[in-house]
């Protein structure tokens, strides 16, 4: 990559939130001002030269590069027609449609190459599992169904995808994707109904992260995820079986066994996580962390009370009762804990653990802002391979913005 791009990647991101494009009229918060070069589009050419190298033919690599450039240049929703309009008009639309929906090129090598590129630019801190509900009203897009979103707690019509995000001190960007298909939900529903469907969702969510991490080839790092509505013990066991450390957000009623003999509740059987934390609130300490949301009141530098307690899951199999830490945070010390997490990173102090949980908050914010700008939700085709190809190239476009700090918001997450 060029020296100016490298210095942008390895230095502190500015995230100035100016508008994108070299005269393309992109919307606010996505790059350089009108008439000025867009750093993300400049970086994208270098990025594509590396991560698209698995495409055998030169014309495929060029089409991939042009598609990424179209995503970066086009403001608003990223339709195939709009992308083609940025790179060549009607003839380009037909060519790009075939390249995305009907071609046979593999997307997994590109995702793995993107992970390696990011690791070299800014070493990985954590993997973050981020579900992505995509409301869609039509009948023809792949994966559309009327379904329950356990993370939002409501029904919606659309697609359900699972993203695996690479999070480092300097950037957060997606590198792995799976779509949860209606066929999987229908097969799971059967006589057992909602419980079986929820179990299928949990299994698919965990499997998507484990698969993406294994393919990425990066060093083992913690996985940050939210399992409040999809299962606790089963999810923790899946990641333990895969050899991946995890820190997972849980619900306040999750049953846990206190294993520290010096603390209230030891030997008293399973207690709900909220009660365990309330009994040790007096041991909590202030922890400082950085809020990724620039609109949050009171500035980005925060301090909240937190505590970590040694616990186990009350698993019927004693062999699976592994040592864990329950981490609690109080946004308001006069109230119940605002967030509860369990982790098998039992040697880390509460401060680094709480800051690690904020990677989930950071990615959720990015997914709703820069992820929208990159077109992660905008594929409208009928073919699942087409969705995978689109979301892979949209991830490359998002990475170009993240690497150059032009997502429209900027916050650096230093070492814990």
Regions found by a protein language model. Name each.
Residues 192-260:
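Domain-level cores of phosphate- or acyl-group-handling catalytic modules
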Residues 3-6, 27-46, 51-60, 181, ...:
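A short, flexible helix-boundary coil/loop motif
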Residues 152-220, 336-338:
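Electropositive, glycine- and tryptophan-enriched low-complexity nucleic-acid-binding patches
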Residues 2-8, 33-98:
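Gly/serine-rich nucleotide phosphate-binding loop at the start of the catalytic core
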Residues 347-381:
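Short amphipathic alpha-helical "interface-anchor" segments enriched in bulky aromatics
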Residues 83, 125-135, 164, 221-229, ...:
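Short, conserved catalytic/metal-binding motifs centered on acidic residues
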Residues 104-183:
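Active-site-proximal, Lys/Arg-enriched surface segment
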Residues 172-173, 177, 185, 247-251, ...:
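An anionic, glycine-rich sequence signature occurring as long contiguous blocks
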């Amino acid at each position: 990559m060029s020296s100016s791009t490298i210095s942008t990647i390895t230095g502190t991101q500015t995230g100035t939130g100016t508008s994108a494009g070299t005269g393309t009229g992109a919307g606010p918060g996505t790059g350089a001002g009108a008439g000025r070069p867009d750093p993300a589009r400049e970086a994208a050419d270098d990025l594509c030269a590396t991560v698209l190298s698995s495409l055998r033919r030169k014309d495929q690599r060029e089409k991939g590069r042009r598609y990424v450039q179209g995503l970066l240049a086009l403001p608003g929703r990223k339709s195939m027609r709009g992308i083609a309009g940025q790179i060549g008009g009607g003839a380009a639309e037909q060519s790009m449609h075939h390249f995305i929906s009907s071609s046979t090129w593999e997307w997994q090598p590109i995702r793995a190459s993107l992970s390696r590129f990011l690791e070299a630019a800014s070493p990985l801190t954590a993997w973050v599992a981020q579900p992505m509900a995509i409301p869609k009203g039509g009948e023809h897009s792949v994966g559309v169904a009327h379904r329950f979103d356990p993370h939002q707690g409501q029904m919606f019509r659309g697609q359900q995808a699972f993203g695996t995000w690479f999070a480092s001190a300097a950037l957060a960007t997606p590198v792995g994707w799976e779509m949860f298909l209606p066929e999987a939900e229908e097969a799971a529903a059967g006589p057992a109904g909602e419980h079986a469907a929820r179990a299928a969702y949990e299994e698919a969510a965990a499997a998507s992260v484990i698969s993406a991490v294994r393919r990425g080839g990066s060093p083992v790092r913690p996985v940050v995820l939210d399992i409040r509505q999809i299962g606790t013990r089963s999810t923790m066991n899946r990641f333990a079986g895969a050899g991946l450390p995890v820190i997972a957000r849980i619900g306040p009623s999750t049953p846990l066994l206190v294993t520290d003999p010096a603390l209230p509740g030891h030997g008293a059987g399973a207690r709900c996580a909220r009660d365990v934390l309330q009994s040790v609130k007096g041991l909590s300490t202030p922890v400082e962390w950085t809020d990724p949301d620039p609109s949050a009141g009171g500035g980005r530098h925060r301090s909240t009370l937190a505590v970590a307690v040694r616990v186990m899951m009350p698993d019927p199999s004693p062999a699976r009762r592994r040592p864990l830490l329950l981490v609690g945070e109080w946004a308001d010390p006069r109230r119940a804990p605002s967030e509860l997490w369990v982790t098998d990173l039992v040697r880390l102090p509460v401060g680094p653990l709480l800051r690690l949980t904020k990677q989930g908050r950071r990615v959720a914010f990015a997914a709703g802002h820069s992820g929208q700008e990159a077109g992660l939700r905008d594929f409208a085709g009928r073919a699942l391979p087409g969705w995978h190809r689109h979301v892979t190239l949209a991830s490359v476009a998002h990475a170009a913005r993240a690497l150059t700090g032009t997502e429209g918001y900027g916050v650096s997450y230093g070492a814990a």
